[in-house]
């Protein structure tokens, strides 16, 4: 619905007939001040909240209203016989500043209810033009007609005092807040901005300045965002102010950059200027003669008061004539108020007043009310904004709102006076502007308004009482359309590739704000409409019908969407079934543009510019008829079956147009009396011969007579029992509103068209059709809601409320105070109401009587609204709420259409279910006291006026009333009458229930079944148990109705001494499971776990524990469940524990179910490698963790965390395997280094590798010693009589270590032989993945890396002689010459090949050419030596051999270049440390890399970890140079 405004109250200013000229509304204290022509000042304090609406009771809303109450009325005598020229409020201190034409300025304030005046200035020389406060009330500005300007602070300190003369009197003045230090003065021909020194900063002239009559009239401050500084749209700035000497503006805060100025001119132009630069940001023609302009708080709306340009203008004329009390020629009343929406400058309302001119206006704090000054009266107006609200099928309300300031600035501006601003039509765009523009200008019109898409609005999805509102903030939103189960949000998309092209993205959301499916349109629609099955979008030249059902089935995978299009489009000048529609659909030129659309599930209405409306059938899109309507419609909506079209026109009138398919007996007889008389003269066909007569209860003959059942009433019972063929109710399908085929054939002639129906209403701001009854429509007009019956063109008594109507639920109207919601989201729970129609209220009073009608909804009305209560939630009905239990039987039942009917002061349904779960709190053997009070009189008989109810529904046919009467008949056990009305209501399920009750012989059993149906379970159980003596039927009925709490309560009572065991364990577990699942859906997991613990389903119990965050119990469940019966459940619980990070609990549970592989994988995924290694070692599956453990170790070692890596490895207790894994890391690094190596090699390249190998050696040594200790302890336990000393223990450990080394040595020999047979080194690397190395081999590899680093460093510092020993030792030169002693370990071979070039370089540099030649021969024999390295060595050799005498022996050799064997005293070759005869090896110092002589052995230190020797040197070593272990 479009937004609107209407007059709420009119107050006479004075008794003497003085005209009011100015008004001001205090937005903090709610005071209204008004000033008149002769100096009268009147202060009013108003209250808009009625007592009935504050009570939060649904029954009170029938008479509630937003009537205005005057709490205070004070008249001040300040300006006697003087014209009031300005009125302004200081809202922070509640001070009122007034001035007059005699130069007097007063400031009045109140203290304890008494108003005190203070004279501020008395200037007899000139009249005051303006006395105004700054927006933050920190400053005050006084402007006089002679140009005198007085500017000061609110406390009285002067800021500026001077005279500014422009040759004429100023029109108005404004003072800015603290954000920017400027003030504004406006003359007729210019608006000037001054700083606080009185220097002019900029000036602007009014648009169309060549017209001498155009001048500035009034202005106010505006607000905008930081991005609003745009390029000037016209050269209206004074060029004299430009230049380097231009005065500057002092800005105190960032918000000062975005301040704007709004001004109106005498020719009706509304202009927006930047305060900082004076640039024109936007302009629009108001088409009135403005006098005053005011911006609402929050800057959402703008109000302009004045008069129409001509007395015959139609603006607001319909609303003016509709107001009561307006007499005489309405053309003399030219006062008008125009309200704009600042987001897009769309017109909200044109409010015509019965006065000559509206001189002033002011907003209240909410921005929803206006006080107007016009003639001799003060008018209070209410603005009813549109929230684009819709009611979804599940009761969710969707509506739009904005929570921050809208901007009145836009990149697209309406400077052209020939174009009007966009109207609030459909979603956003202007229908009238599109109509007035020629077809060739349609595209340019779109370009101007596309950038006005709303980007600051939020779409809220709110299900009252059941959930918090969901929010969606779409970017560049165009429209929001309700489609019953979905909400379609249209957003604007722009394609900037090539030419600028716009398209529309449509996304459909569910009630929980979840996007479900979407579609794109290649154009931007102006008009939209939606139903449950279709979404219709249209521009002026194009129309599209989207099949929602097909999209929904595609989204959930029910259909194959390949080559299927769910959008049907055609051009406006074509028709849906045209053969060339696909070729012409994108054509922009159009002869008869589209100006509106409306649709339902079966019909589509398309309005054209020539005042015709085309009606198509859906889904066939066949043209059914063409209708003629009034021009300039703003809003269109159709009823549920597409037989009535409601149009709200631009003049404010509402018209209902009847289609040719619509039929009403009353309207047809009224408009076609002759044809109706002819039909009456035709004899009616005789009914078939009766086979059985319908007999009502013998005790109530009046009811039978009222129903019209006599001797001629018969029923056929062969095919279907009790199918009534004739009755007093006419054979018309009142639920559809369309004429049946037999009735249409009986009429003579064609179908007549019923004239349009136009109710005399003004200020219409809401219209909702019933989704079930096509004749029922609710209209919001001013402050009341009126229900119309279109079949009789009658209206019900109005319901006075200012709530927005959202939808229908049967005969109830769903309404919400969205105005309050838009200002405070926390008040959502108090803004939802259900209003009853007059028919529902009258039938309720007839059935129960006026004295017995309960305050809230009674059981019968609720039962009807819930469609027989066959789908109620039995858990909520059987729970025992302590404090929030509804007062009626069905208050806790959630109907189908709406989610809940909350009553203020009561608890929502979601909270009522949690009743403490005390199943023994209530006694089910006693009948309900509520039922006794509501249904039974004092003598125990049911007190229901059934005859009066039947008589009432005869004159008010409605399916909803039929259902209520059927429920009343069922409660009184008049089953024949109940069956009849259930048939009339179309409720065949309840009809079959009544027929099944008729087959029962016992009246008590019928009563018990009836009580079960209506929800009075305690009374039904009382009848079953006490009267019939059949407690088993109670259990059966409770099971069928899923009354699980009652079953649990009965089971607990039956297990007491003397109880009957009617409920077995299986049924009890099912009850606990159902209740637990219910609480899981309600997200009350703690309560759910208590029930699911006894459900026999441990997996559901585990899920509830997980959701309830009861993790200790979840872990205990995984340990306590039997493995044989619940293995799968234990595995699922282990996954839950893993999600919580409890690796120990998850792995323990998986090991219990014999799934160690999963336990290892989970431990690896959660980075618990110690647990993974322990489990893998225990179950002999270590091969599955090698890769993961290697990666993790690599990360630790790369980060330098050696201690962390060592601790992790020792926790695994698999030292030998882990050492092999570490060496594998070294192999990969060595392979990379060897391939990418350079010559000479940097010294620090092997530091990381050496550290890794040392770590492996430490781990292997540690594991070996731990195993030796275990063996020693085992040996000691075998010989308990022997005492082990420390010396014996160390000796035994050394013996075990030596034995282990010998066994590993034999293993290495075997591996060496195997390596000889290998074809390549790569194959040997692959086999090394699982090879275990002995501790000496690991430390040998570590020593190789140490010697490579040491020799490389010696070469780096220029000492080749010191590099020869460590390099040759690392290269295993003498081991390679003797093949029997060479090692097949791939790491040793890699390191040897890397060390050979270093040794050769050292020998060449030192001058030992013989040794260098031997080394080069070994290098040349290496086929894998890189060519670049080979060339470097050859060049170095040639260079050195050419410079030196190669036959000479080096003269600089030291004494230790050649040593004797320490065993056989054989002289060894130079730089050789191994004897070939006895295999004696020279000890090498790991600190210097040099051999240790026998006489120096006493000055060495032995490392207990790596067993390496190091000379002490000049300083004592504290740690081992190889493994960095402290010396002991």
Swiss-Prot record:
InterPro entries, per the entry: Beta-prop_WDR35_2nd, Beta-prop_WDR35_TULP_N, Quinoprotein_ADH-like_sf, WD40/YVTN_repeat-like_dom_sf, Znf_IFT121-like
Ranges occupied by WD repeats: 123-170, 244-285, 619-667, 759-798
Annotated region (Disordered), positions in chain: 914-933
One of the protein's GO biological processes: intraciliary anterograde transport
Pfam family of the protein (one): Beta-prop_WDR35_TULP_N
UniProt keyword Nucleotide-binding, yes or no: no
Domain of life: Eukaryota
Low complexity bias locations: 920-933
Cellular component terms per the entry's GO annotation: 9+2 motile cilium; axoneme; ciliary basal body; ciliary pocket collar; ciliary tip; intraciliary transport particle A
Keywords: Cell projection, Cilium, Cilium biogenesis/degradation, Cytoplasm, Cytoskeleton, Flagellum, Repeat, WD repeat
Major place of residence: other
Function comment: Component of the intraflagellar transport complex A (IFT-A) involved in flagellar assembly.
Protein name per the record: Intraflagellar transport protein 121
Source organism per UniProt: Giardia intestinalis (strain ATCC 50803 / WB clone C6) (Giardia lamblia)
């Amino acid at each position: 619905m479009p937004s609107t405004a209407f007059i709420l109250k009119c107050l006479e200013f004075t008794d003497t007939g003085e005209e009011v000229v100015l008004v001001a509304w205090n937005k903090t204290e709610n005071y209204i001040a008004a000033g008149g022509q002769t100096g009268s000042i009147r202060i009013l304090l108003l209250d808009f909240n009625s007592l009935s609406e504050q009570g939060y009771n649904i029954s009170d809303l029938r008479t509630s209203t937003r009537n205005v109450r005057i709490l205070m009325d004070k008249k001040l005598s300040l300006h006697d016989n003087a014209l009031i020229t300005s009125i302004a409020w200081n809202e922070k201190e509640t001070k009122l500043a007034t001035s007059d034409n005699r130069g007097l300025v007063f400031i009045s304030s109140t203290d304890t209810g008494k108003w005190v005046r203070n004279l501020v200035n008395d200037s007899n020389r000139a009249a005051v033009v303006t006395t105004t406060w700054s927006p933050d009330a920190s400053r005050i500005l006084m402007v006089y007609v002679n140009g005198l300007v007085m500017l000061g602070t609110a406390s009285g300190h002067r800021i500026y005092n001077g005279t500014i003369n422009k040759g004429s009197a100023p029109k108005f003045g404004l003072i800015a807040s603290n954000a920017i230090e400027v003030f504004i003065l406006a003359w007729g021909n210019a608006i000037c901005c001054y700083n606080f020194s009185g220097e002019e900063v900029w000036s602007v002239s009014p648009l169309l300045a060549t017209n001498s009559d155009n001048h500035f009239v009034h202005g106010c401050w505006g607000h905008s965002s930081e991005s609003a500084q745009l390029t000037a749209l016209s050269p209206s700035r004074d060029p004299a102010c430009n230049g380097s000497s231009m005065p500057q503006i002092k800005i105190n805060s960032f918000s000062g950059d975005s301040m704007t100025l709004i001004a109106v001119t005498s020719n009706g132009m509304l202009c927006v200027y930047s305060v900082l630069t004076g640039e024109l940001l936007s302009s629009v023609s108001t088409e009135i003669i403005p006098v005053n302009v005011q911006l609402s708080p929050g800057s959402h709306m703008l109000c302009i008061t004045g008069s129409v340009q001509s007395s015959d203008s139609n603006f607001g004329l319909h609303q003016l004539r509709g107001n009561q009390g307006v007499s005489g020629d309405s053309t003399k009343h030219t006062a008008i108020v125009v309200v704009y929406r600042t987001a897009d400058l769309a017109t909200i309302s044109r409010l015509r007043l019965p006065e000559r001119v509206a001189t002033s206006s002011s907003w209240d704090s909410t921005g929803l009310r206006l006080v107007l000054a016009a003639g001799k009266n003060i008018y209070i107006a209410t603005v009813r904004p549109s929230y684009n609200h819709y009611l979804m099928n599940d009761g969710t309300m969707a509506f739009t709102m904005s929570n921050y300031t809208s901007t009145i600035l836009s990149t697209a501006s309406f400077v052209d006076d020939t174009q009007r601003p966009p109207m609030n039509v459909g979603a956003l765009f202007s229908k009238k502007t599109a109509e007035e523009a020629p077809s060739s200008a349609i595209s340019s019109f779109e370009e101007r308004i596309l950038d006005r898409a709303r980007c600051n609005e939020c779409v809220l999805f709110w299900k009252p009482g059941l959930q918090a509102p969901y929010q969606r903030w779409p970017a560049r939103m165009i429209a929001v359309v309700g489609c019953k189960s979905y909400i379609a949000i249209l957003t604007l998309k722009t394609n900037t590739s090539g030419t600028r092209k716009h398209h529309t993205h449509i996304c459909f959301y569910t009630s929980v704000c979840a996007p479900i499916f979407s579609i794109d349109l290649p154009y931007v629609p102006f008009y939209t409409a939606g139903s449950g099955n279709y979404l219709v979008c249209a521009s002026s030249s194009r129309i599209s019908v989207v099949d929602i059902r097909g999209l929904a089935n595609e989204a959930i995978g029910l259909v194959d969407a390949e080559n299927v299009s769910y959008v049907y489009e055609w051009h406006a000048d074509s028709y849906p079934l045209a053969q060339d529609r696909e070729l012409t659909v994108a054509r922009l030129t159009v002869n008869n543009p589209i100006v509106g659309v409306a649709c339902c599930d079966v019909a589509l209405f398309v309005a054209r510019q020539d005042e015709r409306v085309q009606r198509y059938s859906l889904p066939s899109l066949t043209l059914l008829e063409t209708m003629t309507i009034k021009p300039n419609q703003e809003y269109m909506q159709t009823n549920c079956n597409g037989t009535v079209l409601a149009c709200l026109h631009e003049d404010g009138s509402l018209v209902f147009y009847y289609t040719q398919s619509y039929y009403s007996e009353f309207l047809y007889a009224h408009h076609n009396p002759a044809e109706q008389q002819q039909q009456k003269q035709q004899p009616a066909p005789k009914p078939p011969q009766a086979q059985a007569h319908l007999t009502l209860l013998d005790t109530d003959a009046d009811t039978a007579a009222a129903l019209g059942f006599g001797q001629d009433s018969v029923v056929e019972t062969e095919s279907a029992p009790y199918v009534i063929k004739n009755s007093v109710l006419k054979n018309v399908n009142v639920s559809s509103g369309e004429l049946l085929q037999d009735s249409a054939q009986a009429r003579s002639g064609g179908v007549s068209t019923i004239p349009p129906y136009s109710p005399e209403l003004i200020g219409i701001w809401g219209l909702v059709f019933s989704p079930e009854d096509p004749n029922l429509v609710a209209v919001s007009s001013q402050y009341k809601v009126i229900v119309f019956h279109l079949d009789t063109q009658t209206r019900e008594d109005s319901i006075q409320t200012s709530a927005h109507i959202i939808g229908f639920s049967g005969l109830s109207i769903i309404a919400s105070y969205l105005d309050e919601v838009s200002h405070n989201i926390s008040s959502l729970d108090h803004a939802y109401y259900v209003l009853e129609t007059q028919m529902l209220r009258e039938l309720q009073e007839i059935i129960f009587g006026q004295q017995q009608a309960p305050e809230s909804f009674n059981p019968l009305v609720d039962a009807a609204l819930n469609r027989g209560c066959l789908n109620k939630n039995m858990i909520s009905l059987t729970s025992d709420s302590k404090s929030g239990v509804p007062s009626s039987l069905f208050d806790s039942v959630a109907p189908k259409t709406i989610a809940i009917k909350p009553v203020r002061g009561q608890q929502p349904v979601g909270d009522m279910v949690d009743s403490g779960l005390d199943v023994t709190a209530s006694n089910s053997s006693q009948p309900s006291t509520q039922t006794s009070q509501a249904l039974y009189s004092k003598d125990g008989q049911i007190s229901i006026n059934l005859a009066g109810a039947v008589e009432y529904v005869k004159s008010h046919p409605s399916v909803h009333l039929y259902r209520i009467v059927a429920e009343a008949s069922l409660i009184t056990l008049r089953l024949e009458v109940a069956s009849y009305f259930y048939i009339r209501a179309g409720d065949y399920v309840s009809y079959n229930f009544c027929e099944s009750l008729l087959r029962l012989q016992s009246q008590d059993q019928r009563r018990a079944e009836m009580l079960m149906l209506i929800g009075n379970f305690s009374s039904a159980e009382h009848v079953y148990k006490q009267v019939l003596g059949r407690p088993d039927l109670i259990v059966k009925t409770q099971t069928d109705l899923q009354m699980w709490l009652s079953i649990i309560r009965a089971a607990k009572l039956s297990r007491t001494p003397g109880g009957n065991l009617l409920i077995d364990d299986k049924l009890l577990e099912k009850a606990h499971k159902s209740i637990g699942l219910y609480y899981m859906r309600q997200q009350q997991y703690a309560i759910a776990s208590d029930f699911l613990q006894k459900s026999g389903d441990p997996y559901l119990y585990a899920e509830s524990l997980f959701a309830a965050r009861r993790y200790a119990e979840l872990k205990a469940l995984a340990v306590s469940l039997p493995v044989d019966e619940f293995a799968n459940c234990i595995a699922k619980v282990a996954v839950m524990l893993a999600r919580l990070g409890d690796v120990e609990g998850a792995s323990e549970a998986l090991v219990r179910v014999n799934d160690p592989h999963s336990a290892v994988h989970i431990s690896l995924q959660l980075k618990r490698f110690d647990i993974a290694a322990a489990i893998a070692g225990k179950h002999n599956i270590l091969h599955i963790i090698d890769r993961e453990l290697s990666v993790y170790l690599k990360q630790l070692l790369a980060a330098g965390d050696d201690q962390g890596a060592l601790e992790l490895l020792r926790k695994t207790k698999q030292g030998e395997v882990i050492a092999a894994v570490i060496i594998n890391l070294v192999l990969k690094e060595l392979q990379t280094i060897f391939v990418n190596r350079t010559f000479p090699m940097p010294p620090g390249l092997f530091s990381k590798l050496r550290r890794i190998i040392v770590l492996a050696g430490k781990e292997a040594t540690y594991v070996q010693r731990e195993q030796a200790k275990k063996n020693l302890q085992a040996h000691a336990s075998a010989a308990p009589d022997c005492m082990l000393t420390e010396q014996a223990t160390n000796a035994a450990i050394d013996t075990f270590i030596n034995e282990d080394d010998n066994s590993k040595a034999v293993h290495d020999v075997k591996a060496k032989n195997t390596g000889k047979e290998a074809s390549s080194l790569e194959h040997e690397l692959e086999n090394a993945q699982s090879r275990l190395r002995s501790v000496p081999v690991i430390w040998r590899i570590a020593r190789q890396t140490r010697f490579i680093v040491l020799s490389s460093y010696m070469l780096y510092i220029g000492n080749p002689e010191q590099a020869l020993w460590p390099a040759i030792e690392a290269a295993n030169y003498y081991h390679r010459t003797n093949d029997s002693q060479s090692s097949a370990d791939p790491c040793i071979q890699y390191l040897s090949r890397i060390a050979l070039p270093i040794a050769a370089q050292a020998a060449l540099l030192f001058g030992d050419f013989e040794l260098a030649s031997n080394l080069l021969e070994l290098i040349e024999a290496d086929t894998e030596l890189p060519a670049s390295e080979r060339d470097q060595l050859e060049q170095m050799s040639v260079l050195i051999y050419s410079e030196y005498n190669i036959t000479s022996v080096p003269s600089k050799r030291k004494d230790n270049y050649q040593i004797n064997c320490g065993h056989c005293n054989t002289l060894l070759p130079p730089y050789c440390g191994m004897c070939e005869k006895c295999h004696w090896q020279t000890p090498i110092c790991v600190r210097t890399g040099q051999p240790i002589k026998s006489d120096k052995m006493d000055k060495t230190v032995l490392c207990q970890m790596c067993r390496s020797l190091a000379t002490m040197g000049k300083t004592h070593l504290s740690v081992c140079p190889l493994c960095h272990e402290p010396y002991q």
